[in-house]
Curated annotation (Swiss-Prot):
One of its GO terms (cellular component) is cytosol. This is Serine hydroxymethyltransferase. Its EC number is 2.1.2.1. The record marks 230 as: Plays an important role in substrate specificity.
Length: 426
């Protein structure tokens, strides 16, 4: 019988092995609706848990500061080539440890402290690294935030243009953590050109949709594109920088190393290469299309049950439920769905009167459960489970019924069954 990494871990450190097994069971037994999460393939898990974790490899393929990198170079070059092929980019750096590290490398390459940047307000769907005052991006740079239209709850490109002309930013950031609609990257390009700004697209949430043509690509029009490699791309947790400009790519490489990182995580880079290879296959395009269909089914059914959806729907993998329509906070809704084994997250909605610790919204995503094989009928049922729970917060019978319905869905669409034979350790 082939032994797994978990077998070895069980012998050496049963405490950690037991916790890993409990986390595995949590993932198997819950409906994962956090929009930024997904499930990697077993092949990605295998690459990340490989002997490549033993090797230091500062530098780039063919230009290392350590010996013994002949195979590491081939692994990283494969990741680079596959990323370029997947996104039709002229240059790729696969070394950023995260999306935040990728963004910071771009700032280091293009900006000086005190420069002006423009990004979406966090409460409207932006990200911490786009100028939030609690992040280094908000401390080192002068930040101008834009938001969505109060009526449509979608980007107001004319208002963004006016802000850009008023403040003349050095860098404009587009791409978000909680925006459910198509981003018109060409309109951002026109605005950036009018004011002489660099244009950065952070496509962390939609990278898998971009790769398969289900969302317009920022590569042809943006100066730099960053992304995480998990979320809709379904790879390991990590970052990636892409550009259509090879000369700018050299500058970005230096901003990653030695600019803000040391040794790259080559075991993670190998896992990225595997994920990029998977994303190049026809079945991944089918998967991405289903991700959108499932999110739209979830959104439409929740609307049928009386919930308000921010921007009245979704074009991608995520949706925001505005809980003010039922007089509930995001914090409470998060707690209520958690009690029936549904994992989601409270989230601010545009013009939210509540604090970020309470919020008026619930963010939901379809990527992870689509990976498990669920389709639109299952997502309609998920919407009904959520609605039944939130509309009956005090009904204990509903709690038990919803848990059973969640369990039935999870049993029909198993996750990592090959890992399930290891017993839970006390």
């Amino acid at each position: 019988m082939t032994r797994t990494n978990l077998d070895f871990l069980t012998e050496t450190d049963p405490a950690i092995a037991g916790l890993l097994q409990q986390e595995l069971q949590r993932q198997q037994d819950h409906l994962e609706l956090i929009a930024s999460e997904n499930f990697t393939s077993a092949a990605v898990l295998a690459a990340q848990g490989s002997v490549l974790t033993n090797k230091y490899a500062e530098g780039l393929p063919g230009k290392r500061y350590y010996g013994g990198c002949e195979y590491i170079d081939k692994v990283e070059q494969l990741a680079i080539d596959r990323a370029k092929d997947l996104f039709q980019a002229a240059h790729a750096n696969v070394q950023p440890h995260s999306g935040a590290q990728a963004n910071f490398a771009v700032f280091l390459a293009l900006l000086q402290p005190g420069d002006t940047i423009m990004g979406m307000d966090l409460s409207h769907g932006g990200h911490l690294t786009h100028g939030s005052p609690v992040n280094v991006s908000g401390k080192w740079f002068r930040v101008v935030h834009y938001g969505v239209d109060p009526v449509t709850e979608q980007l107001d490109y004319e208002k963004i243009r006016q802000l850009a002309h008023q403040h003349r930013p050095k860098l404009i950031i587009c791409g978000y953590s909680a925006y459910p609609r198509i981003i018109q990257f060409d309109q951002f390009r026109a605005i950036a050109d009018e004011v002489g700004a660099y244009l950065l697209a952070d496509m962390a949430h939609i990278a898998g949709l971009v790769a398969t043509g289900h969302h317009p690509s920022p590569i042809p029009v943006c100066d730099v594109v960053t992304t995480t490699t998990h979320k809709t791309l379904r790879g390991p947790r990590g970052g990636l920088i892409l550009t259509r400009d090879p000369e700018l790519g050299k500058k970005l490489d230096k901003a990653v190393f030695p600019g803000n990182q040391g040794g790259p995580l080559e075991h993670v880079i190998a896992a990225k290469a595997v994920a990029f290879g998977e994303a190049l296959r026809p079945e991944f395009k089918t998967y991405s299309a289903q991700v959108i269909k499932n999110a739209q089914a979830l959104s439409q059914q929740l609307q049928q049950r009386g919930f308000k959806i921010v921007s009245n729907g979704t074009d991608n993998h995520l949706l925001l439920v505005d809980l003010r329509s039922i007089g509930m906070t995001g914090k409470l809704a998060d707690q209520l769905v958690s009690e029936v084994n549904i994992t989601a997250n409270k989230n601010t909605v545009p013009f939210d009167p509540e604090s970020p610790f309470v919020t008026s919204g619930l963010r939901l995503g379809s990527a992870a459960m689509t990976t498990r094989g669920m389709g639109t009928p299952e997502f309609i049922e998920i919407a009904n489970i959520i609605a039944d729970r939130l509309l009956n917060p005090e009904d204990l019978a509903i709690v038990q019924e919803c848990r059973q319905r969640v369990a039935q869905l999870c049993d029909r669409f198993p996750l990592y069954p090959h890992l399930s034979r290891v017993p839970v350790l006390s």
